[in-house]
UniProtKB/Swiss-Prot annotation:
Originating species: Coccidioides immitis (strain RS) (Valley fever fungus)
An annotated GO cellular component: nucleus
Source lineage: Eukaryota, Fungi, Dikarya, Ascomycota, Pezizomycotina
Cofactor note: Binds 1 [4Fe-4S] cluster.
Name of the protein described by the UniProt record: ATP-dependent DNA helicase CHL1
Main location: nucleus
Amino acid sequence: MNPSSKTFYHPYSPYDIQVQFMRSLYTCIEECKVGIFESPTGTGKSLSLICGSLTWLRDHKRSVFLEDIENSDGDDEPEWILQYSRKEKRRIIRERRKRVEDRLSRIRKEELLREKAAIANIPFKKQRLEDGKRHLDKMADDGAFELDEYDSDNQETSTHDAKSNSDLSATTIALLEKLSGSAEIQDDFEEENAVKIFYCSRTHSQLAQFARELRRVVFPPSIPPETEDGEIDTQGEGRRHPDTELEEPTKHVSLGSRKTMCINPKVRRLGNATAINERCLDLQSSNVLPGHKCPFAPSKENELAINDFRDHVLAEVHDIEDIGKIGQRTGICPYYASRSVIGHSEIVTLPYQLLLQKSARDALDISLKDHVIIIDEAHNLMDVIANIHSVNVSLTQLRIGLEQLTIYARKYKARLKGKNRVYVAQVMRLLGSIAKYLESVLAARELREGAVDPSYLMSGKGIDQINLHKLSRYLQESKLARKVDGYIESSTSLEEKNPETSTTVPVLFQVQSFLLSLMNPSAEGRLFFEKNGNDVLLKYTLLDPTAHFREAVEEARAVILAGGTMSPMSDYRDHLFSYLAPGQLRTFSYGHVIPTSNLSARPVSRGILDTEFDFTFEKRNSRAMIIDLGKTISEICKATPDGVVAFFPSYDFLNQVVEIWKQPCSNSGNPSILDSLGLVKPLLYESKEKAMNTEALLQKYANFIDEGKGALLLSVMGGKLSEGINFSDRLGRGVIVIGLPFANIRSAEWQAKIQYVERKTYERSSGGEETRRSKAKLAGRDFYENACMRVVNQCIGRAIRHQHDYAAILMFDRRYGTARIQSKLPEWIRRSLISAPIGATISNLYTFFEEKSSIEVTKEK
């Protein structure tokens, strides 16, 4: 399969960089590589990912089909018999595929009629939803919260299944397995092990946008047509037999969490994901009587509805909301029923957490073996993996959890027998020990945060006699947290008559998550405390995500990371994929689709008052520098039309700057810098405390620009406006980045991260002692700088969002003039970067925007 000759079936005329992207992507997948792709926003990255990967997939399926036909049994038979056998096999496969496509085509026509007539199956839907309400109202019996008898102390065996299916009844599990791989379904659909693409991104809105792009593309079928002579037309050159041509729309399913996909109103209203998960599992437990189970869950009675759900999902490309509506129409839980679709899909879209967390993959019966993984918006992938496997618990939560356990133990004292009584007492003892340690930390005034030795948490009386491995299994198998929370919730609602939703995480679930991390520590995990007023937060933090991602990488055929700003890429090579053999990892950085004349990028090391801009932590409080900053921004705003967005390194520094700008410049009654800025452009700024939400702030900003006044928006790197917000065209003619948002290197957490990187680098390095230490120190410094520069690059990427866009990007700090920092900027920025004095920079801005304005006027004429 030669990617250089491919058209990739792009719905438009692709840019050269898109063609390069698609070819490199195709090659990476074909050669089973790990690829990192950087392509700026506005360059059509999503369509490049779709066209490159699905072109490869259809080619691969076509090759498998042809190989399967050629490798027919009976090679010792006469050639005419072999030819007949191959032709017959082609006919059977083609007819099977045609039956599928015809059925899905009928569904598409039905859906079109449904939309036109606006007909919905409201009575059926209401009946199903009302059934769900009635069944849920029967869950308040005290007996539902009693612990099952527990005696699974054998460490070698356990009844616990790591998958969430462990709580389902045997009939439900059997049905799910049947629906995902029955002979009848496999006769018509792709087999379970057919290669597919798993595409994930940060949010469901991004996945919905991806689905919209997916609808634009049409690919040739995976089964090639035959010529009139009965030969397979692999080149597309012969006269085709019309009966052998197939239409094969892309098969897609979008997956989500229970919180996203649940259609049971009384479960959905719980609000919190953990509470929804636990209530859902409660209603599917094998111990629940049939009449009390969730009516939307798969069962023998609604098997036909599940098949109907599957066909409707596969008939067209749907986003997660569409799939929820299909579930409501068919009366089937989309979360569970989607499993019957995964095996028959070509591309599966899902949010980060469902792909990156093994327990989530197990819950959905997702196997990554020999499939293709594409992770979009992957610039923060290492942080995302670390956050998924990190957990916090506060002293307040521990106290509440201990109180709830005490109430529960008293209520069920007579019924708690044997191992249940022993283990509940052990959990209470462990919580008490951890709480006691945190109380001592709170009482000590000298430190606000620091590292925690795990042994300090286990210093309570009798803790050394607890077998943490057994207790960990007990917490998972007994469902203690669920039982206790259910009882507490039931008691509270009965007394206070307050059945409204609660969006907070149930305390004992949070406590249990922390305890499980504590009992099963990763070699890459560390414990920290952080004081917050009269409370203390205890944090289990994963320092290195490599091991948690490695299993997925080694299972998959190929792994693709893509993003608009993946630079600097050295962290992926040196840390996330450090175990890969040379040549197994490939990196690609593509330029922008805009001409270089549409970008003015300048480092600004001095202001118009000739103050050096040095926004390091030690020097950024200089009043003179902050005043010069304001005056310089004012001059830049005069030269820049429409919207200007300025990013500060932190909320604290932004607030400090604004306070100084509010003060009069002298005693002569001159206006403040803030007033002066307001005369040039209306001024808005992001604040943690401000009541105005992000949408309202952006709308106000856009309104000023639409009115022709322009606007200056002060925001924060790493804040709400620095990621996922498009400041295209007039919204972002100027982007100013002020300083470098380095994390607090003195914090215990960052000290631990850097020490970990240095130690791993030292262990991997060769050479003498001094050389190894030098490499380790350099690696730690790089890791620290790269974390900062990823945030900077995200801010820079907010502007210039399409081919005809243009903007000026100015980076205020002397460090932006150094080769080391510039090397960590995206390539398309580096190519346009010019250093000049501030006077020349401002003069260039006037010229730059005057030229752009004259071009726009000419176009309008």
